[in-house]
Amino acid sequence: MPRSRTNGNFIDKTFSIVADILLRVIPTTSGEKEAFTYYRDGMSAQSEGNYAEALQNYYEAMRLEIDPYDRSYILYNIGLIHTSNGEHTKALEYYFRALERNPFLPQAFNNMAVICHYRGEQAIQQGDSEIAEAWFDQAAEYWKQAIALTPGNYIEAHNWLKITRRFE
């Protein structure tokens, strides 16, 4: 039985019911339906902190999903898991792959910026201001892209860009 059918969370159950209805109404292939089921189960496991199970579901969804736009969200969620696990290099790779398929994911740009900013802070703690500035400059570029896609969002990043004179 798919995970989404056994989940006790009200929101997840509601999402599952709506998704099942949409899958019946919207013309989709069996492969697309199966890919979505794995994606949905991955989101459910991820929301509960079951990252290994979520990754298994996402990898299976990636194997089945052919639409680049849908694949971008799978890749983005894999990036989120790697970020949560502190695997920043892997996370950056998955965010980048998501953006290759869908360049309109401001949240991926934001997460990449946060990782770069964090690495800049680490470099400062290690006494390497030159490396820190390079990381901060990269964070600024990613934040500018996120802000350009969704003006009015990422207020803290926007303020940081102004304060550090990185906003043009």
Swiss-Prot record:
Each TPR repeat, start to end: 35-68, 72-105, 120-153
Keyword annotations of the record: Chloroplast, Membrane, Photosynthesis, Plastid, Repeat, Thylakoid, TPR repeat
SUPFAM superfamilies in alphabetical order: TPR-like (SSF48452)
Name of this protein: Photosystem I assembly protein Ycf3
Lineage: Eukaryota, Viridiplantae, Streptophyta, Embryophyta, Tracheophyta
GO cellular component terms given for this protein: chloroplast thylakoid membrane
Family matches, as Gene3D superfamilies: Tetratricopeptide repeat domain (1.25.40.10)
Family: Belongs to the Ycf3 family.
Organism: Solanum tuberosum (Potato)
Primary location class: plastid
